[in-house]
Amino acid sequence: GQTKDNGQVSACLFTEPKFIVDDTFLLDYSMFFGATLCDYYEASSDRETLKDLSACAYRQMEIAKEQFDEKELMKKGDGFWGFIDWTDGLNKQSAMQGVYIYCAKKVQKIAEILGDAEKAEEMKKEAAAKTAAAKKYLFDKESGLFISGEEKQINYASQVWLILAGAVDSAEGAEILDRLVELKPEKGMVSPYMNHHFVEA
């Protein structure tokens, strides 16, 4: 009972004086439930917990899937719909596309571990479709960087998350980061959280 009525995981859970779900729901945080669960299993080999929480992980991806348009691109949500970073004026659509691909692959791995071939194949197809769309519509050949939103914004978050998602190979990713650092786009990074992912990429 620690989710929204539709099953979405909240961005925050208060534990004192009793368990209370925060009313802030951020799509990237919800998707990371599955990625975190996968990482937890890989560190602990706790199959029972993996199995118990797998349905919740699957549900987060189902909810996120509703946010895509006919081109398989992430639509801009209403209000404070995703975190990504505190950068003012940050267009988050391409970064969120990357988070979705990244988490779909993690949830695919969960399904494979649990022997759910149907769910694993579904997540594999989702990741492939969203990756193809990112390459077709979000990669700007002129700058050699990913762009985001109607304004075709170039920001750190889009590059980082689409690289971490595996939308490009490691060599291409390195080239993108080199171009990014050289360009120094206006929309940089604010939080240690985002800087950590930049280093990881």
Indicate residue ranges for each PLM-predicted region.
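Active-site core of glycosidic bond-cleaving carbohydrate-active enzymes
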Residues: G1-A201
